[in-house]
Structure formats: C-alpha cells, structure tokens
C-alpha cells in the first residue's frame, strides 16, 4: 500500500493518491474484487474532494489468496490510518481532531459516488474517546494509546449472479397458530437465525422462540444469495420484515372485525392480536383464508454507486462505522507488547440481538489483535514457514485483554428496524490502533504487520542511529498499472437521497 495526501494547514484533506499492489498467490480467486475494495472503501470515512486510485494484483508461486473477514479493507485501512497519524504529527494536530475535521456526514455521496445514509462515525469517535479518556492519556515511558476508525458495507449492492432477481426472499406460514419462517440465508455462526426470528416475532407480537425457522435448505426455502459481505441482517432481515408485516395485516384485519373496530385500533404484542390470543386470531384467519402464507423480498435500491469502470465494487445500501482505542505497554528492552485494554464503539444502526452483537464485536477485536500481533503468511525459498495450525500462531485467552464494547444506534432509514452490520466492521480499526499505540509508547513506526518485538527493536535501533525510527517496506513494487479513467465526482447531496 502506498498513499500520498494533500492536506491544508487546518487539517482538511484536499486530495489523495492511493496505490495497491496485492500478492494474490497462484490463482485468481476474488482478485479483481479484492483489488478494487482496497481503494473503494477508503472514501466512506473521510471527505476526499479529489481521489486517485491505482490497483494491481499479481500472480506468484504461493498459496492462493481469497476473501476473509473485512474483505479487501484491513490492509488499506491499516495504511491509511497510520498515514493520517503521521500527517497529524507533522502539522501539529491531535490525531482525533484531524479525523473529525474530515469525517463524512449522513445523506451524502463520496467522491467515488458511494451513497452514505446513516452515519455514526462522529458518535462512535466521541463515545470511545470519552470511555477511554484518550485525551487525558498519560505519557509514561513505554505506555501508549492508539486510535483509529473504519467502516464496512451492509451487503454488496450488486448481486453475485447478474440478474434482476431479489437478493433475499422469505416465506412466512401460519398454520393452526404455529409460525414458520422459510429463508435461504445460512447461519454460519454469526447469529442470523436469531435476527430473522426476532424480526418476525417483533412484528407479530410473539417471542423469538415462537418462530420455527427453516433456513439454508434450497429444497424448502426461497433463495438468499449467501452469508458474505455482512449482508444477511440487512437484506434477509428486510425480507423477513416484509413477510411478517403482510402476515400481521391479515391477522389484524380479522381481529378488527371480531372486535368491531378499525385495524388501526388493534394493538399487537405479548402474544395477542388486539383482545385475541395470537392463536385465536390465526385460527379465525385460517378459517377464512385457508393456510396463511406471505412472502417478503429485498432488492437494494438503484443508484448506490457510480457507472465508471470498477464502480460495481463498494456500493452498499448502508455502511457501519467503528472506532477503537487500544491501551498497551511496550518493553523498550525487548519490544514485547502487553495489551491492557481495548475500547471499541460500533455504529450498529439498531441492535436486534445485543448479546450476539457484543459477541461479534469481541470476536472482531480478538481477530484483529491476532492479525496485528502474531499472524503471518511467511515463506522461505518458496516454502510456507507455518504449514499447519500447530506452527501458525493465533491468540488465546492468555494474550487477550479486556474489551469494552460500546454500541451506538443511529437507526438506518433502510435497515430492518434500523439495523446495520456488525460481523466484519469491528475488526478493521483494531489493527492500526495497535500500531499507533506502539508509536505513542516508543516513538517508532512499524508499518508492517504483524507488529512483532523484532520489528520494534529494529525500529528503535534505526531511531538510535539517527534514522526516522521506522520499520517497513522501503520501496514500492515496480509494477505496471492499468490506464486510469477520469471520473467527475457526484454532487454532495443528490436528489436520489
């Protein structure tokens, strides 16, 4: 990653040039999308009036690479956040204040035409800075605190199958008082089943445990495009909400006739439809209409992004925002890092299942700490140095610090009950926040992950010899970039919003 930014004396970003060179290994995999993501999502956090992006992915004789948590964003976010820290230091501005002066705002377009709706980046910054007392941090030797922010999409705006079919579909059936929701979305551990059950139950006045789910079975459930790009809560959740609202309208209509009132006077909740138990209303409706079945679908709105080459990567119906502060100590004699605490604030839109949301945040934090402190794909003479999980170092409970999770609800206008993603976003700011904290502790920059003791000691040695106190790449790969297209930026607030 290579980045150059033009900044005014007051800290306002004027222009940015971002270059990416990815080592893709032996095969193509998601190479084009991964490459474009490294440039597309930098603009969802900061206002960048003029932006130039160049990206290339090369084939090498290594294991093939593919997408993982935060697809295409951890590496460029690490580069950009440390880059902004260096700018803040150079112009004598607090790193948090520098970012605040450049944050995107709700209901705008980025320079690459991405649509921003709800945006809690300022709120998550305020909450995490206040909770960690970042502004009052101590300056004792070897102790450091680092800050970083990021954002992530709530599902890809374009489908993986090039057709005009819905991105997600749900069918809701009520028979003899029992409720079954059918959806093709697959719960791979992220808790999407609880989201679908909670959304349907909330609309029907039931408990989530009252909803029977049939998911991930293409023989019974309608199509959902899959569990990727943090899309299931937003897209399948909206489909479930539509199906449940249609079922609610049927039951409320029957209950209103039975009660002799208008549908608007019928209250739904606590297992009741007006004065009737849910089962009673369901039986009455089934006597009249037969088996009750409704469906719901979700298709992202049009015009989420631009029409230039590569614009299909990055658009999303919404974006979540995260901010992290890391507190640590570094031994200047050995470079060993002791993590003390991590604060992470996440703009969730609305938390549908707070326990699951907090679990996702903590999982993202721990995964980010593993990536920044110990995990690496290292090769020597063409051979992988960690060919098994026995050799590949990952964090355990012994290395992990206390994590304070702060949820910020901004109520996205298009999410189900205002909800947004949480599966991937919280990982992203943790990695640069650790490197920033190391610099705060010792005054050296480690511009390469993982940030290991030997790299810290080499940076300290460079500083002692009168150098810049930095460890990282010295030269950018000499690669040929594709011819660039010049694209006019959109209006700041188009009428489409």
Name each region found by the language model.
Residues 1, 166-168, 322-324:
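Short, small/polar residue-rich loop motifs at catalytic or cofactor-binding pockets
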Residues 22, 36, 40, 148-178, ...:
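Conserved beta-alpha junction segments in alpha/beta enzyme cores
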Residues 18-27, 186-188, 342-349, 409:
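Short, solvent-exposed aromatic-acidic interface loops
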Residues 1, 17-19, 25-32, 59-60, ...:
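Short acidic, glycine/serine/threonine-rich loops at helix termini
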Residues 9, 34-152, 199-497:
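C-terminal catalytic domains of large/alpha subunits in multi-subunit enzymes
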Residues 1-51:
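Active-site cavity-forming subdomains of large catalytic enzyme subunits
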Residues 12-17, 140-143, 175-180:
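Immediate post-signal peptide segment of exported/extracytoplasmic ligand-binding proteins
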């Amino acid at each position: 990653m290579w980045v150059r930014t033009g900044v005014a004396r007051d800290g306002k970003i004027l222009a940015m040039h971002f270059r990416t060179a990815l080592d893709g290994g032996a095969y193509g995999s998601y190479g084009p999308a991964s490459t474009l993501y490294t440039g597309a999502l930098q603009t969802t956090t900061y206002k960048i009036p003029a932006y130039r992006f160049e990206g290339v992915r090369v084939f090498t004789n290594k294991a093939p690479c593919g997408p993982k948590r935060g697809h295409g964003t951890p590496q460029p976010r690490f580069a950009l956040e440390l880059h902004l820290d260096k700018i803040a230091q150079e112009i004598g501005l607090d790193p948090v204040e520098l970012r605040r002066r450049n944050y995107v705002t709700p209901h705008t377009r980025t320079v690459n035409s991405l649509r921003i709706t709800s945006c809690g980046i300022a709120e998550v910054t305020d909450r995490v800075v206040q909770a960690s007392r970042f502004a009052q941090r101590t300056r004792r030797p070897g102790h450091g605190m680092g800050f970083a922010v990021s954002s992530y999409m709530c599902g890809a705006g374009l489908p993986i199958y090039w057709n005009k079919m819905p991105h997600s579909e749900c069918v809701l059936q009520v028979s003899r008082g029992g409720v079954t929701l059918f959806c093709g979305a697959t719960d791979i551990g992220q808790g999407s089943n609880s989201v679908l059950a909670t959304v349907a139950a909330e609309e029907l006045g039931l408990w989530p445990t009252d909803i029977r789910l049939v998911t991930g079975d293409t023989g019974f459930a309608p199509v959902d495009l899959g569990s990727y790009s943090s899309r299931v809560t937003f897209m399948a959740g909206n489909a479930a909400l539509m199906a449940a609202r249609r079922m609610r309208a049927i039951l409320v209509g029957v209950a209103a006739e039975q009660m002799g009132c208008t549908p608007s006077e019928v209250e739904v909740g606590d297992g009741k439809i007006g004065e009737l138990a849910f089962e009673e209303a369901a039986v009455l409706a089934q006597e009249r209409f037969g088996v009750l079945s409704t469906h719901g679908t979700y298709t992202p709105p049009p015009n989420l992004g631009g029409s230039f080459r590569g614009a299909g990567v990055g658009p999303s119906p919404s974006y979540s925002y995260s901010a992290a502060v890391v507190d640590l100590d570094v031994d200047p004699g050995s470079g060993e890092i002791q993590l003390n605490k991590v604060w992470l604030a996440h703009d969730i839109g609305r938390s549908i299942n707070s326990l699951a949301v907090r679990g996702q945040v903590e999982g993202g934090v721990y995964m980010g700490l593993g990536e920044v402190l110990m995990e690496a794909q290292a090769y020597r003479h063409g051979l992988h140095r960690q060919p098994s999980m026995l050799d590949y170092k990952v964090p355990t409970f012994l290395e992990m610090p206390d994590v304070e999770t702060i949820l910020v609800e901004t109520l996205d206008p298009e999410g189900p009950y205002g909800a947004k993603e949480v599966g991937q976003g919280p990982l992203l700011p943790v990695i640069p926040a650790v490197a920033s904290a190391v610099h705060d502790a010792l005054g050296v920059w480690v511009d390469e992950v993982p940030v290991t003791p030997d790299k810290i000691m080499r940076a300290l040695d460079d500083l002692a010899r009168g150098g810049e106190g930095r460890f990282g790449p010295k030269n950018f790969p000499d690669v040929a970039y594709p011819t660039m297209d010049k694209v006019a930026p959109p209006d700041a607030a188009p009428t489409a919003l």
